[in-house]
């Protein structure tokens, strides 16, 4: 079972927009990097490479979900702006 949730896999329909925003929007890139760092940390915990309390793991998962929501909103906004 694949534990990782990379944005390109989560939102394949936004692949080009993700690539464009990573190089053109510093705020997006920072959130993108933070999302992937959280995702990597969660996977390391779930694979028992790193250790964390249940509370720490839950907080990290909530942070990842919040970042994913923010990034998705930004992707939708950029996609809608490109369509106009």
Label the model's feature ranges:
Residues 1-84:
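Extended, charge-rich alpha-helical interface modules
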């Amino acid at each position: 079972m694949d534990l990782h949730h990379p944005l390109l896999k989560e939102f394949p329909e936004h692949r080009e927009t993700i690539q464009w925003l990573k190089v053109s929007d510093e705020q997006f890139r920072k959130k993108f990097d933070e999302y992937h760092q959280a995702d990597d940390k969660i996977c390391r915990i779930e694979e028992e490479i790193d250790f964390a309390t249940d509370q720490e793991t839950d907080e990290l998962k909530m942070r990842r979900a919040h970042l994913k929501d923010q990034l998705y909103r930004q992707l939708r906004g950029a996609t809608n702006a490109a369509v106009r």
